[in-house]
């Protein structure tokens, strides 16, 4: 992001320059930018840059907003705040498209999910939109019921254990 900027500027200057909505203070608070408003964008960490990039999108008016992994470099609290802030962009005249691999953020952020699968540099397929829970199930199962097609050989599953010892015993057996 800093390389895309032609000149050096502070977080606040850049937000002011793109301000098209009456939500700057709310976005600054939600993205936790209060302490970095006077800092040069070239001096921000990865997480600070991510929060700044989200804020820059959120202060602008658009018919469609696109976010590529908005939760990258953010801690859990920041991820939920980012998702909450992004959801405020939705109205009858605007849409949000997000690519996200964190299923909890995806669950919170989305109304519908499309899964993408294929072979790099060969082909790619996008599923029809599914409700959130069904879309996450398609992703985890690797099976698309509407197309009667498997997009991955193995399902992804999670094991729940009361203690770490149970997991250690299972791994060693």
Question: Across the structure, where does each feature detected by a protein language model lie?
Answer:
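ABC-family P-loop ATPase nucleotide-binding domains
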Residues: 1-46
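ABC ATPase nucleotide-binding domain signature region
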Residues: 1-20, 49-52, 101-136
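Hydrophobic anchor residue at the start of the ABC signature
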Residues: 54, 82
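Walker B catalytic motif
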Residues: 67-70, 77
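ABC ATPase nucleotide-binding domains
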Residues: 126-173
């Amino acid at each position: 992001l800093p390389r895309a900027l032609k000149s050096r500027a502070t977080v606040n200057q850049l937000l002011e320059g793109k301000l098209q909505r009456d939500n700057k203070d709310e976005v600054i608070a939600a993205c936790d930018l209060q302490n970095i408003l006077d800092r040069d964008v070239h001096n921000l960490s990865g997480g600070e840059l991510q929060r700044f990039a989200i804020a820059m999108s959120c202060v602008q008016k658009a018919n469609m907003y696109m976010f590529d992994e908005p939760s990258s470099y953010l801690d859990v609290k920041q991820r939920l705040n980012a998702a909450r802030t992004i959801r405020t962009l939705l109205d009858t005249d605007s849409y949000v498209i997000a690519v996200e691999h964190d299923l909890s953020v995806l669950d919170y952020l989305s109304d519908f999910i499309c899964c993408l699968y294929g072979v790099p540099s060969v082909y790619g397929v996008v599923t029809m939109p599914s409700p959130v829970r069904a879309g996450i199930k398609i992703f985890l199962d690797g099976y698309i019921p509407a197309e009667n097609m498997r997009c991955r050989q193995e399902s992804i599953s999670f094991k729940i254990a009361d203690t770490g010892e149970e997991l250690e015993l299972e791994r060693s057996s």
